[in-house]
Amino acid sequence: MKQLTGAQIRQMFLDFFQEKGHAVEPSASLVPHEDPSLLWINSGVATLKKYFDGRVIPQNPRITNAQKSIRTNDIENVGKTARHHTFFEMLGNFSIGDYFKEEAITWAWEFLTSDKWIGFDKELLSVTIHPEDEEAFTIWNEKMGVPKERIIRLEENFWDIGEGPSGPNTEIFYDRGEAYGNDFSDPELYPGGENERYLEVWNLVFSQFNHNPDGSYTPLPKKNIDTGMGLERMTSIVQDVPTNFDTDLFMPMIGATETISGEKYRNGDLEKDMAFKVIADHIRTVTFAVGDGALPSNEGRGYVLRRLLRRAVRYSKKLNINRPFMFELVPVVGEVMKDFYPEVLEKKDFIAKVVKNEEERFHETLHDGEAILAEVIAKAKEEKTTVISGVDAFRLYDTYGFPIELTEEYAEEAGMTVDHEGFENEMEKQRERARAARQDVDSMQVQGGVLGEVKVASEFVGYGTVATESNVVALVKNGEYTDSLQVGEEGQLMLDVTPFYAESGGQIADRGYLLADGVKVLVKDVQKAPNGQNLHKVVVEEGTLTKDAAVKAIIDTKNRSSVVKNHTATHLLHQALKDVLGTHVNQAGSLVTSERLRFDFSHFGQVQADELEKIERIVNEKIWESIDVEISQKAIEEAKEMGAMALFGEKYGDVVRVVQVGDYSLELCGGCHVDNTASIGIFKIVAESGIGAGTRRIEAVTGKSAYELMNDQVGLLKEAAGKMKTNPKDILTRVDGLFAEVKQLQKENESLAAKLSNIEAGNLTDSVMTVDGVNVLAAKVNVADMNNLRTMMDDLKNKLESAVVVLASVNDDKVNILAGVTKDLISQGYHAGKLVKEVASRCGGGGGGRPDMAQAGGKNPAQVEEALAFVQEYVKSVSK
């Protein structure tokens, strides 16, 4: 067998299928673009759904890729098994209605066994097929020469996700030899069984049937191929190592961790070996995910990253690492993956900063968790139990990130145990919630629809013209071809030549009219058809529109003018964000309309007011410099060498359109732009907000919209100045004066309230009753808020020295209740928190707190007197 690195295997796979006429699809971002069904890209086929479901017709129906992927449904097994990972690469070859079983099997066999490629010994390979797939059996047996005894028929070899495309699959297994299993009495020791000897290296799915709603299967009009080979597993076989973690894809991270910890991998300690594996796996996942724009948080993708980092930190303690260190592994990951993913090294400083910040936070969290755990232990002792409940242990784990193992250690020190079964029950409930929320990757939807059949040419000329003579080359109504559209009817059409821009890259579509003799057609929207033509959504306002009609296509120039101002402004904004916030900023989405622009970008904190001011000023300065906007066509490699920014979620061909604003901004973009920045006029930021973990949004306006916004704001300023009887330029001074007056009045009010409270407290001492030898005061008082209630409580406790006091006040139909117990009575079992909870429950509320002071609220003012009457009963119950 050849000696190959993981990087060489990846490149060899892509080169092989490129030789077989496949287009190499770049590895997409781990953060799905326009696919809400996925938390992460989790397979090679996930990024190709648009081709399989017919929304987009690929230029080449043969596709190959090496797709980075994340799966987190089995995190707890990572490190325990030889091949569980959260981050992995899936190598695949795909056919969209082109070749089928014979080619897929033949090429897989060639790649695996040819000396030019991997060069496996054919005798060490076995395959599994579906019992009824005689076609696959014949190809394997007669064409590939695989003997019958190494072709295993298994019922589970059928790919089916319910309604939609489905079909049999065949899997290829490699025999690693007797060192990995030689007990042939083991019922699982066969290719396809649960064993370490026969490893699956490749899965070929033959999508040939449609699973109908009635449960029947019918042949698909177009048959597809979807294959997957895990790079990590393949590398472990080629490099002849026991687990994926022992390959050159993981060992550099393990080696770096050895250096940091002073511990050794594979030194006879299985727990420490597991820690090395967990750290190596999780830092790969976090590094790539952060590089693709995800950031740690308490929800969604961010929660996954936070959980992975915290799990790795917890395992690092087994290696005696008690400081932030994971960030030091980020450049190691970058070096391992630099051949295919150079962007990791390019972003290593930012990624390391994010990881270090999260590590530091978790070390603080561990400290906080210890405090919460101390409260849990105290509560358990108070309830006279030696078991920490599974609910409490899970809350510590899930909310505070406090590992169950640490909870058990602390519990043992306190002479207690943890309800592990209860904890696992809570974990299973969480898994059930996750399973319920998870959606299967529906990569191949039902085929059909006439738009995918339309192959006529349609040229977009809208960059240089706003009106053109054209012909209707395709006309569709209600999803079917039609020869005409009558007045009031809606439909879709294609033109042989069109000035109408189809919505893409965040820029909305043009609108306008198609005109002919006696015919007027409103163009409401324009989208890309499956084969790439501009598809116009129209409604006939006058006359009858027929297929092949000659029309004049005219866009709404006023609308386009506003759109291009906003689009060029987004390019200036993008660069300004990088200048002010840092090079880690990447576009995460945009919307360019005629009214405003919206720009989403990656950033791990709120943009401060002074930063926003700098960003806005930079954009306006570039507008006022009257910079020419130059647009050119470049080879993709040349454009990248120039430093052009490729945008989020976009796919680019060999030749790209480059939009350059002087020497300031350089981006790949297919949208429409101004000729000179001066046309934008002015740029004004309207809002900045967070829209998700690590993603911020800026909304802004330009030109006329910016003028109208600022004019409205100046008008409001003048109106406010008038009401305060001052000039706009003096309004801040006037506001400061008013605030000072209000503050002084508040002080006087508080002083007066305190005096009144003291007087009322003095009067209340006459209402003190003695219950079983305890001074008790329960009274409804007339105070404004809880602060005044606390002041009165302090006065009463000082005056009475030993007492149980409960005060209630009513304001705006809301009840405030405060309970206080002096120190001498706390030791006798009196507890303000328990008391106030009982009182509040009797007037429709709840609350709690410390033994000496506790507060609550109620919703039923009419029941306050009755609730206060309970205080005497409480004192009697404790004194017994």
Curated annotation (Swiss-Prot):
Its main location: cytoplasm. Keywords: Aminoacyl-tRNA synthetase, ATP-binding, Cytoplasm, Ligase, Metal-binding, Nucleotide-binding, Protein biosynthesis, RNA-binding, tRNA-binding, Zinc. It comes from Bacillus cereus (strain ZK / E33L). One of its GO terms (molecular function) is transferase activity. It catalyses: tRNA(Ala) + L-alanine + ATP = L-alanyl-tRNA(Ala) + AMP + diphosphate. One of its GO terms (cellular component) is cytosol. SMART domains: tRNA_SAD (SM00863). This is Alanine--tRNA ligase. Belongs to the class-II aminoacyl-tRNA synthetase family. NCBIfam families: alaS. PANTHER family: ALANINE--TRNA LIGASE, CYTOPLASMIC (PTHR11777:SF9), ALANYL-TRNA SYNTHETASE (PTHR11777). It is found in: Cytoplasm. Disulfide bonds: none annotated. Its EC number is 6.1.1.7. Binds 1 zinc ion per subunit. Zn(2+) binds at residues 567, 571, 669, 673. The keyword Electron transport does not apply. It comes from the Bacteria. InterPro entries: aa-tRNA-synth_II/BPL/LPL (IPR045864), Ala-tRNA-lgiase_IIc (IPR002318), Ala-tRNA-ligase_IIc_anticod-bd (IPR018162), Ala-tRNA-synth_IIc_core (IPR018165), Ala-tRNA-synth_IIc_N (IPR018164), Ala-tRNA_ligase (IPR050058), Ala_tRNA_ligase_euk/bac (IPR023033), DHHA1_dom (IPR003156). It holds the Pfam family tRNA-synt_2c.
